Design a protein with these regions (language model features):
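Glycine-aromatic micro-motifs
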Residues: 2-141
Length: 141
């Protein structure tokens, strides 16, 4: 079961992004991430993507063929950056429940096959009627 979004010193300084926070997006939060995190490479996590308006939502999946493609970063100041990203994603303490996203630790696989834990934002609202991004790649939708 994924870990909750509460920060502690035993948590990961890794962040897996799969949508508008990826490199190349001209978005203020993508620029913040690019300026305060080290790009570690492309990565995948088990899950499915749905299109929510103009942005994606990641859903958990146990099926080995369900992969979401994205990018892995090492955060320079994890606690501060995650707080900023939580505000952007409107999740965590102080936001009405249920929040649209939950920040959770997931297993990600790097291009070299190594796996590690990373934070990501998992979609938390009903998905009825939302189109699935079959490729698992937001940029290909």
């Amino acid at each position: 079961m994924p870990s909750s979004q509460r920060w502690n010193t035993m948590s990961s300084d890794r962040l897996f992004v799969y949508g508008t926070l990826m490199r190349g997006f001209d978005h203020p939060m993508a620029r913040l991430l690019a300026g305060h995190a080290e790009f570690l490479g492309e990565a995948t996590c088990r899950g499915r993507l749905v299109l929510v308006k103009h942005y994606p939502g990641l859903l958990h999946s146990e099926a080995p063929t369900d992969l979401v493609h994205g990018e892995l970063f090492r955060l320079s100041v994890p606690e501060e950056l995650l707080r900023e990203l939580d505000m952007y994603e409107a999740c965590g303490e102080g936001f009405p429940e249920p929040t649209e996203y939950l920040r959770q630790l997931v297993d990600v696989t790097r291009a070299d096959g190594a796996t590690e834990k990373a934070w990501t934002y998992v979609y938390n609202w009903p998905v009825t009627g939302l189109p699935r991004i079959e490729s698992g790649r937001f940029l290909e939708h």
